[in-house]
Design a protein with these regions (language model features):
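PRPP-associated nucleotide enzymes
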Residues: 1-136, 140-195
Length: 195
């Protein structure tokens, strides 16, 4: 049985409640059979792009992720394309000017044109070597997708102490990440929602 991953305490429970409402109204699809990235099927699905590309949703996500980062000394936030891209953008924007963070995203595979880089968003001379990175995810199930990003970032010489997800489906990600010495923090879990 997977280890339960309770949401970490946040400084603004009202923002958390508001985000729960926005996700419930915009992103939670019920009574539909979907295939998850993990390969499992589910009768509910979080289409988080509908929240991440919504003004209030993006603002709340950024605020609550920054709350989760408060106790960490972090240089960059990043994540795997596509789900993490809007999260990284809203978090780094909101981090300025108080605690400016760098940001990037990890491609699933390099393009065959352009810079052909696996990690995008860094200047040519910029490196993750020796940096501390927290990876972001919109929804986490088993952690398989974000572990690919962890491996890519570690290959560049960065440390990844933590992954922060907006919604943890509580299907084993915390245990799988722990095996790689990565803590999983969540803003919300599946138990917060009426399914």
């Amino acid at each position: 049985m997977p280890t339960p991953n309770a949401p970490n305490p946040v400084s603004n429970p009202k923002a958390r409640a508001n985000l729960l409402q926005v996700i419930s109204e915009r992103s939670l699809l019920r009574d539909t059979e979907v295939m998850l990235a993990s390969g499992a099927s589910s009768t509910f699905y979080f289409d988080m792009k509908r929240t991440a590309f919504h003004a209030e949703g993006a603002s709340l996500i950024a605020q609550l992720i920054l709350d989760q980062l408060a106790d960490l000394d972090v240089d960059y936030v990043g994540g795997l394309e596509m789900g993490a891209v809007p999260l990284v953008a809203c978090v780094i924007q909101r981090s300025f000017p108080d605690r400016p963070l760098g940001g990037f995203f990890v491609r699933k595979q390099p393009k065959d044109h352009g810079t052909r880089r696996l990690i995008e968003g860094l200047r040519q001379e910029e490196s993750l070597a020796g940096k501390t990175v927290v990876l972001l995810e919109d929804v986490t199930t088993t952690g398989g997708s974000v572990l690919k990003a962890v491996a890519a970032v570690r290959e560049e010489g960065a440390s990844v102490p933590c992954v922060i997800t907006v919604v943890d489906r509580l299907e084993g990600a915390a245990d799988n990440l722990k095996k790689e010495s990565v803590e999983l923090r969540s803003v919300l879990t599946v138990h917060d929602f009426v399914l």
